[in-house]
């Protein structure tokens, strides 16, 4: 029989928990939204951090924003109730690591302008990294004495082209590497980067990064695709803008890693993918199964590879419509190993709904245990003829209900 407590007894029990300063117990209290004002005064920084994570009171967040503990700062910034006013207080925190967290997370341009003048360079580094930082601030930071700050400016997709052009003449190799990585770096800058004088090893690394940049000219695409250096061919084969005709050439490369990049590149046409499948190589087939533009016509060939990982990868490829996969389920309904594998790893509602009606109890057990199985399907499975299926379905539904209640409590 459950013992009942009076309100006074419950109050005493909670007060004793607070006094014991047990973080696990206090986390439960704080998560429910209780006693935040009292808990935030604790001398234990872990308990104050718990309040910073769960409170919906902006006044409490403002008070905690002066705390120098980095975990408290992170929890405040991750709290959905954190306002720009709270961020402004954090931006003046005496702990530079707290200020750098603000610089990394905020989207407020006034705060970013303020932190761009911070006395600690690693705070400025985070400002340079933030894509919400205004271009004029990034331009100013591109002249910073620390190459680490200039490197972040060179990486930032919000950096203006004329600023990127200036950084082309930077003496530090790391800044040039960052320029090569930036998806906003123009074709013209990339071509001039190729002319930079560096050590042989550094030049190779720079060229690899350039080969992956989507803004390559047609000439550079051809140059990298024909390079005697396999790492350059491997890099350009992964480029999201490489033309299909060059991928067709690279599909015949003698290096397996080059062909694998061709196999999973979205620009590779059906004919080239079909050619690669003829290799009957497990790794190549796995890469094809991940291709976002995998043609449905190739599915029968892929399934013939008969490897569990490939099967589940295909069924989780979000670009393949359900209508392309449901016939496969129907055709291989009696292949228990295949069906069991799909039931265990699939994240598709339509597939799991179909498999919930499978004759095999082991398949239905796996479906009921799959976190992607729709709630409506689990509700039906509560009445399954198999005790184990019913038990798992009930447990899943209970866990989801608990999770929903916790989410609702946080939103309140």
Where in the sequence are the language-model features?
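Alpha-helical scaffold segments
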Residues: 2-412
């Amino acid at each position: 029989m459950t013992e009942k407590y009076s309100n006074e007894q419950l109050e005493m029990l909670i007060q004793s928990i607070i006094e014991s300063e047990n973080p696990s117990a206090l986390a439960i209290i704080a998560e429910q939204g209780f006693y935040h004002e009292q808990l935030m005064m604790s001398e234990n920084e872990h308990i104050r951090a718990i309040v910073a994570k769960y409170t919906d009171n902006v006044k409490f967040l403002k008070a905690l924003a002066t705390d120098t503990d980095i975990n408290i700062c992170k929890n405040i910034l991750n709290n959905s109730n954190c306002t720009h006013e709270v961020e402004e207080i954090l931006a003046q925190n005496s702990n530079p690591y707290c200020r750098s967290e603000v610089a990394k997370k905020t989207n407020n341009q006034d705060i970013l302008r303020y932190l761009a003048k911070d006395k600690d360079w690693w705070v400025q580094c985070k400002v340079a990294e933030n894509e919400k930082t205004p271009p004029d601030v990034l331009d100013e930071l591109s002249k910073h004495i620390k190459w680490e700050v200039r490197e972040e400016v060179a990486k930032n997709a919000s950096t203006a082209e004329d600023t990127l052009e200036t950084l082309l003449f930077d003496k530090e190799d790391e800044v040039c590497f960052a320029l090569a990585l930036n998806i906003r770096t123009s074709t013209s800058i990339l071509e001039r980067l190729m002319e930079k004088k560096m050590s042989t090893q550094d030049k190779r690394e720079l060229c690899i990064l350039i080969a992956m940049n989507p803004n390559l000219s047609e000439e550079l695409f051809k140059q990298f695709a024909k390079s005697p250096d396999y790492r350059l061919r491997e890099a350009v084969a992964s480029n999201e803008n490489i033309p299909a005709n060059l991928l067709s050439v690279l599909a015949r490369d003698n290096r397996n890693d080059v062909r694998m990049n061709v196999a999973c590149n979205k620009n590779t046409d059906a004919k080239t993918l079909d050619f690669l499948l003829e290799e009957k190589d497990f790794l190549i087939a796995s890469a094809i199964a991940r291709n976002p533009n995998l043609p449905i016509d190739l599915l029968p060939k892929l399934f013939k590879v008969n490897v569990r990982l490939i099967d589940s990868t295909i069924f989780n490829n979000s670009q393949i419509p359900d209508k392309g996969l449901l016939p496969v389920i129907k055709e291989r309904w009696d292949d228990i190993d295949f069906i069991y594998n799909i039931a265990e790893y699939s994240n598709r509602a339509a597939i799991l709904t179909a498999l919930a009606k499978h004759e095999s109890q082991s398949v239905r057990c796996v479906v009921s245990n799959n976190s992607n199985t729709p709630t409506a399907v689990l509700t039906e499975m509560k009445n399954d003829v198999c005790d184990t299926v019913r038990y798992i379905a009930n447990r899943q539904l209970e866990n989801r209900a608990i999770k929903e209640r916790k989410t609702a409590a946080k939103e309140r």
